[in-house]
Swiss-Prot record:
Subunit structure: Homotrimer. Interacts with the inner capsid protein VP2. Interacts with the outer capsid glycoprotein VP7. Interacts with the outer capsid protein VP5*.
GO biological process: fusion of virus membrane with host plasma membrane
Main location, first listed in the record: virion
Function: Intermediate capsid protein that self assembles to form an icosahedral capsid with a T=13 symmetry, which consists of 230 trimers of VP6, with channels at each of its five-fold vertices. This capsid constitutes the middle concentric layer of the viral mature particle. The innermost VP2 capsid and the intermediate VP6 capsid remain intact following cell entry to protect the dsRNA from degradation and to prevent unfavorable antiviral responses in the host cell during all the replication cycle of the virus.
Residue intervals passing through the bilayer: none
Molecular function per GO: host cell surface receptor binding; metal ion binding; structural molecule activity
Region Interaction with the inner capsid protein VP2, annotated ranges: 62-73
Protein name as it appears in the record: Intermediate capsid protein VP6
HAMAP family assigned: Rota_VP6, Rota_VP6_A
Binding site for Ca(2+): 266, 286
Binding of Zn(2+), residues: 153
UniProt keywords, alphabetically: Calcium, Capsid protein, Intermediate capsid protein, Metal-binding, Ubl conjugation, Virion, Zinc
Amino acid sequence: MDVLYSLAKTLKDARARIVEGTLYTNVADIVQQVNQVINSINGSTFQTGGIGNLPVRNWTFDFGTLGTTLLNLDANYVENARTTIDHFIDFVDSVCVDEIVRESQRNGIAPQSDSLRQLSNAKYKRINYDNESEYIENWNLQNRRQRTGYLLHKPNILPYNNSFTLTRSQPAHDNVCGTIWLNNGSEIEIAGFDSECALNAPGNIQEFEHVVPMRRVLNNATVSLLPYAPRWMQRAVIPTADGLNTWLFNPIILRPNNVQVEFLLNGQVITNYQARYGTLAARNFDSIRISFQLVRPPNMTPGVAALFPQAAPFPNHATVGLTLKIESASCESVLSDANEPYLSIVTGLRQEYAIPVGPVFPAGMNWTELLNNYSASREDNLQRIFTAASIRSMIIK
């Protein structure tokens, strides 16, 4: 993988810098690197593809090195150089694709395609290494079973989960109390509701709690917490728990009280915030517990009192909500996030070439299903194919 990254980095720089009219002395360093690549790979043969609808391609290399000149690069020099560079770029792209579409239950961090295994040969170690990529650094660490670390922006760590629970219900759902939530990616949106507006709750206070486990530990997270849940602040028709009927959710918004957010690691509270909104920081955690209250207003104008009657029927739901977003964090495991398109690249290629479902990844690279069973095998394979996707993204931009 190191060699593949160094190849891609060298070829990307060469394509950008070797242009007509450039003074040779300004590009002599990258020309020498390209010549090092040519001398290392000339005489080699590779084969890529042969899985799903990915066609088999045979690669041979017999190129002359790029020359030197005391003058500016002319059109002929650039054209000859581009022919060589484009062939190597096409080869690197094919190796990346071949690697992305393969998986293995055992040692999934190691190269799975014959072409990438071949590039691990000592013969190619002469190629200039450039390991500045976060993915390459972490791939090397994971390959040696050492601790890795990824900086993530809006990490997709929460599997999709959209549901509700009722702590009080009637067959007609005309007097209900409970919570409704949507967890997905890096965001939790939770609302507590009560048809009676805490009329019969102790002290006219209704308690709510929402616990969200995660499949991996996050470190040094920046989190935002806001006292509203916009997705649950509008009327909605909601299926009953048995799916045989529907009921009308008709929220009237109140501000939540006594809000508490706890970040836990292995069941122990690491960071705790009370009645604090805006930007929060959490050191390390693998689950989040959110608790809050709905308090019946002690004083109401006639218009408000009409919304929350003292007896049935109860046409509305007093509702309090919260939105928690994980803005950034570090994680030892590879995840998709808002900054990088690698999940899309991987999924698109596997669909394009009709790659059969293998022993590791779910059909269609379903991210929710993948997270719900984020095994060590999946993590190894995901780190490898995301690394290949990061290399491919350099040369196809």
